[in-house]
From Swiss-Prot:
Residues 1-161 are annotated as: Necessary for interaction with SRP54, nuclear localization and exon-skipping. Residues 1-170, 240-305 are annotated as: Disordered. GO terms for molecular function: RNA binding. Part of pre- and post-splicing multiprotein mRNP complexes. Auxiliary component of the splicing-dependent multiprotein exon junction complex (EJC) deposited at splice junction on mRNAs. The EJC is a dynamic structure consisting of core proteins and several peripheral nuclear and cytoplasmic associated factors that join the complex only transiently either during EJC assembly or during subsequent mRNA metabolism. SUPFAM superfamilies: RNA-binding domain, RBD. There is a cross-link at residues 7, 15 (Glycyl lysine isopeptide (Lys-Gly) (interchain with G-Cter in SUMO2)). Gene3D superfamilies: 3.30.70.330. GO terms for cellular component: ASAP complex; cytoplasm; nuclear speck; nucleoplasm. Residues 1-220 are annotated as: Necessary for interaction with the cleaved p110 isoform of CDC2L1. The gene is RNPS1. This is RNA-binding protein with serine-rich domain 1.
Length: 305
């Protein structure tokens, strides 16, 4: 009994030792597997951390870009607002040195532009003034130039030297007129028309021609409304007739041709008459013959039907 108990105890001790050894020292294969798993886990953790860090970096970059773009747009809007405020109100002061310098520049530029615009609107530039003055001077100088040209073209009207004397009595003769009008100047010619039936009687008017136009004017002043043989007369100046241009010779119309002689007219007419019936006769015969045949054929076909 004691031996069996000792054996049991020894077996139990061996089992416990085996258990302890199994728990204390694992096998080398298990150790390798565990080390591989740990290394894999570590590599996975590292990859995940790298990916997360890269993602974080990308997010940070995008955030920085957005913030930079928003900041630049905000700075642009601020600078534009400050410049507009500076141009509209030059007395307003800005907080920053950069904004103050920008506003002062924009204000100065706006003031210079406004001053230039006001000066341009109020008083035109010298070049515009010159242009306007040239236009005005040209427009003003055009009509007198035209008048001068017209005056140059029109020759000065000659002063009259001939005087018409009317309402004369039949007792007045050329000698009487010569005596009266010779007191005002030298007379070149006296024309006193006479009646055909009674050549010793005048028609009641006369023409007196002086050598100088001044003498003719004197005679007009003194004798217009004067009396000769107890009757008032009229004295008027006679203007010299304008020299008429010679009449133009009208050229004969080109369409009208000179008539042909008789010996040329007759042969072509005879030839035309002789040729025309010869040409027409065969054409008429040809045109009639097929018509008759067709008419006959149609009538025959109708009768057969």
């Amino acid at each position: 009994m004691d031996l069996s108990g000792v054996k049991k105890k020894s077996l139990l001790g061996v089992k416990e030792n085996n258990k302890k050894s199994s728990t204390r020292a694992p096998s080398p294969t298990k150790r390798k597997d565990r080390s591989d798993e740990k290394s894999k886990d570590r590599s996975k953790d590292k990859g995940a951390t790298k990916e997360s860090s890269e993602k974080d970096r990308g997010r940070d970059k995008t955030r920085k870009r957005r913030s930079a773009s928003s900041g630049s747009s905000s700075t642009r809007s601020r600078s534009s607002s400050t410049s507009s405020s500076g141009s509209s109100t030059s007395t307003g002061s800005s907080s920053g040195s950069s904004s103050s310098s920008a506003s002062s520049r924009s204000g100065s530029s706006s003031t210079s532009r406004s001053s230039s615009s006001s000066s341009s609107s109020g008083s035109p530039s010298p070049s515009r003034r010159r242009h306007d003055n040239r236009r005005r001077s040209r427009s003003k100088s055009k009509p007198p130039k035209r008048d001068e040209k017209e005056r140059k073209r029109r020759s000065p009207s000659p002063k009259p030297t001939k005087v018409h004397i009317g309402r004369l009595t039949r007792n007045v003769t050329k000698d009487h007129i010569m005596e009266i009008f010779s007191t005002y100047g030298k007379i070149k010619m006296i024309d006193m028309p006479v009646e055909r039936m009674h050549p010793h009687l005048s028609k009641g008017y006369a023409y007196v021609e002086f050598e100088n136009p001044d003498e003719a004017e004197k005679a007009l002043k003194h004798m217009d409304g004067g009396q000769i043989d107890g009757q008032e007369i009229t004295a008027t100046a006679v203007l010299a007739p304008w020299p008429r241009p010679p009449p133009r010779r009208f050229s004969p119309p080109r369409r009208m041709l000179p008539p042909l002689p008789m010996w040329r007219r007759s042969p072509p007419r005879m030839r035309r008459r002789s040729r025309s019936p010869r040409r027409r006769s065969p054409a008429r015969r040809r045109s009639r013959s097929p018509g008759r045949r067709r008419h006959r054929s149609r009538s025959s076909s109708n009768s057969s039907r």
